[in-house]
Amino acid sequence: MSAIFNFCAGPAMLPPAVMQKAQKELLNWNGLGISVMEISHRSKEFIALTEQAEADLRALMEIPSNYHVLFMHGGGRGQFSAVVNNFLGNDGRALYLVDGSWSKAAAEEAEKLVGKANIDSIELVSAVNCLNRVTLPDLSKIDKDYRYVHYCPNETVDGIEIFDDINSPWPVIADMSSNILSRKIDVSQFGLIYAGAQKNIGPSGLSIVIVRDDMLALPSLPQSSIMDYRLAVENDSMYNTPPTFAWYLAAEVFAWLKCVGGVTEMEKLNIEKARRLYECIDELDFYVSGVAKENRSRMNITFQLTNSQLDSQFLAEAQAAGLVALKGHRSVGGMRASLYNAMPLAGVDALVGFMRAFAAKNA
């Protein structure tokens, strides 16, 4: 069978080496004669797995000792409400920086929970010469008191990524669901980082939360116990039964990432993958990117065909060539190629080759 390259925005492809290992030990994990899906989450074998997973993630991201690492339910949307309920209390206010669909959704969820009067938002994206460009505000000039500032550094729908740090007098909370582990960051610049697993970590159903000690002292609102960060810390992410198979696969992805050189080497590869695809888009008049170069996402590359009537043909022929899940989000249309960590350079080269051939044939 010819190679299939999966460009889905999420759930996304997992490293083949991880999938093959999971397949091999599915019915007999760790020599126990049963699957990792079947053992108690409180068994010494599974506890050892969770401890290694946390240690590997801490090493990969250089997480300081004053941060807790939590493995939780709910994905990114679950964290939209968890952040509000854990930190705003009865009188807290928060600022949301909106650079695309997911940061907008987070702000709307916050407004629903505590009212618009307690949530401020700033739109970061404007169209300049038909290109979407991000302008970061000077937060030091805002004469208000916020519990936190929330933003999403990579917007999967819009193909926008913010590479600059957010300089804020208030704790910064980041939704890194789609670019965690794709490039080096300074974790100490954040009060909290959260990420749904289904893009760069593992399958859906799991979310990672990295929270600084002092954030847990902020007043909270009544909420579901399974989304309470303090309870999660006190119970080592096992207040209730966790998504064990997703946790196991996340542990395997972390181990794989360490084996291939860690985040430093992965960032180099991601830069090269994105460079090759954007170079193709820019060279050919057949395709167009709607994002300014300094804000183009490395993870989710959005583009349009100049003749949109060819969209269906492009997708059908790409699928036949083993290049799947290239259709853009329904809200924006066009195409989207998601180049998460597991996507090999060969997949990008195959896509670029197809795009050049398709353009030549249909120009």
From Swiss-Prot:
L-glutamate binds at R42. Its main location: cytoplasm. Disulfide bonds: none annotated. GO terms for biological process: L-serine biosynthetic process; pyridoxine biosynthetic process. It catalyses: O-phospho-L-serine + 2-oxoglutarate = 3-phosphooxypyruvate + L-glutamate; 4-(phosphooxy)-L-threonine + 2-oxoglutarate = (R)-3-hydroxy-2-oxo-4-phosphooxybutanoate + L-glutamate. Pathway: Amino-acid biosynthesis; L-serine biosynthesis; L-serine from 3-phospho-D-glycerate: step 2/3; Cofactor biosynthesis; pyridoxine 5'-phosphate biosynthesis; pyridoxine 5'-phosphate from D-erythrose 4-phosphate: step 3/5. The keyword Amino-acid biosynthesis applies. Binds 1 pyridoxal phosphate per subunit. NCBIfam families: PRK05355.1, serC_1. PANTHER family: PHOSPHOSERINE AMINOTRANSFERASE. This is Phosphoserine aminotransferase. It comes from Shewanella pealeana (strain ATCC 700345 / ANG-SQ1).
